[in-house]
């Protein structure tokens, strides 16, 4: 009976530790996403280059491309992510992969024209060693803005 009770206690403590680690990873991803929006606004391609995985994919309304093209577009101002008003964020951790969903209104300058669009943005992060790398960033334009 003692062994059973001890096993149950150790299992519960292990589950609590796993939950705490997961909550910590979720907060780390939320913070990283927030920093990413600021770096994109600032056109900080050095920080973004460290964050983006070399094989990352970026899906926009106008097409999809890889890391080098995304960094070139940001640096040149082809797309200037001026401000992301974030309304909702959710994070799901699956092993060494984090999937973050943002519901945002994005103020951007595209080809010299300033536009604001509602998006559901999917960010996929992969844990490599001690750091997270962005593996995918996809913008899905929403047809209507959900009620707050």
Question: What are these model-predicted stretches?
Answer:
Residues 7-16:
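Bacterial N-terminal signal peptides
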Residues 21-50, 55-148:
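A beta-strand edge to alpha-helix "cap/lid" segment located at domain peripheries
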Residues 1-5, 20:
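Positively charged n-region of N-terminal signal peptides that target proteins for export
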Residues 5-6, 39:
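Intrinsically disordered, low-complexity repeat segments enriched in small/polar residues
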């Amino acid at each position: 009976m003692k062994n059973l009770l001890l096993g149950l206690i150790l299992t519960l403590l292990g589950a609590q530790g796993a939950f705490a680690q997961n909550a910590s990873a979720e907060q780390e991803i939320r913070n990283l996403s927030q920093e990413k929006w600021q770096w994109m606004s600032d056109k900080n391609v050095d920080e973004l280059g460290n964050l983006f995985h070399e094989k990352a994919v970026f899906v926009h309304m106008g097409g999809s491309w890889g890391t080098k093209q995304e960094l070139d577009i940001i640096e040149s101002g082809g797309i200037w992510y001026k401000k992301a008003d974030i309304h909702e964020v959710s994070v799901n951790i699956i092993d060494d992969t984090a999937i973050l969903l943002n519901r945002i209104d994005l103020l951007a300058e595209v080809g010299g024209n300033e536009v604001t669009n509602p998006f559901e943005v999917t960010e996929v992060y992969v844990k490599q060693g001690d750091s997270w790398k962005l593996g995918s960033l996809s913008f899905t334009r929403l047809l209507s803005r959900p009620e707050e």
